[in-house]
UniProtKB/Swiss-Prot annotation:
It comes from Mycobacterium tuberculosis (strain ATCC 25618 / H37Rv). GO terms for molecular function: transmembrane transporter activity. This is Oligopeptide transport system permease protein OppB. The complex is composed of an ATP-binding protein (OppD), two transmembrane proteins (OppB and OppC) and a solute-binding protein (OppA). One of its GO terms (cellular component) is plasma membrane.
Amino acid sequence: MTRYLARRLLNYLVLLALASFLTYCLTSLAFSPLESLMQRSPRPPQAVIDAKAHDLGLDRPILARYANWVSHAVRGDFGTTITGQPVGTELGRRIGVSLRLLVVGSVFGTVAGVVIGAWGAIRQYRLSDRVMTTLALLVLSTPTFVVANLLILGALRVNWAVGIQLFDYTGETSPGVAGGVWDRLGDRLQHLILPSLTLALAAAAGFSRYQRNAMLDVLGQDFIRTARAKGLTRRRALLKHGLRTALIPMATLFAYGVAGLVTGAVFVEKIFGWHGMGEWMVRGISTQDTNIVAAITVFSGAVVLLAGLLSDVIYAALDPRVRVS
């Protein structure tokens, strides 16, 4: 199993290196960081523009710039922004913000999706299954930013109905919050509910559909009937044998689900005013900053890499054939 995971990790690292190479080269070709400087009125002298281009390394070939960038990136130095600020410093501050959303959203969304999907398969075509299926399809067909705004409107109505600020929907914390550690922690959790719920709903809707189909494929298999014939109750046969087998394809899907959440986090952070990686990505593209976009690509790729590695571990734990081979 260790050799299997080592091979998978090596494959992921190669893909991460390829993603960083393509992102850096393509953004370097598409971006023009000096455009805002050249469009100033009055236009700066050409010597000033050339000096700025030299500072940003724009007077060197793209491959040479990438080689220099990646040689520093492996040591944690992702260069500077076009304004001269260290990318690594801002990256370290924003990673925690985005991971908070991604971890909470993916964990709750995955667990809820698996439970709902398995429950729907066991109670196929009953009222609860039809309701869950309809709701899942409705969430899947609704863009993330629409779901986020609907949750904000719902929070406004709840706050107005109860007469207190039960849900906060702007920023990561309330400015000037007083009190001890528990008060500040409670404030952060209060701000975390709506954005993480937005991501969790999208994840739960997708996972529930796949889990339901996987569970339905298992329910009619011979080993379930054999387990029942040996005296196991239906509940125990489904939980011990059916659900375990149905979770195997879900382990592979987990990495792709996390990749979708990383994309959805861009909209969620902008809508809820969270200063994370998604919001920074939008700013980096608008300012045509290659170093910012490349650094965020490495972060996003690393998150998907870890999710893929975790899915491989879960897959190996669920499927004995992987451990034996």
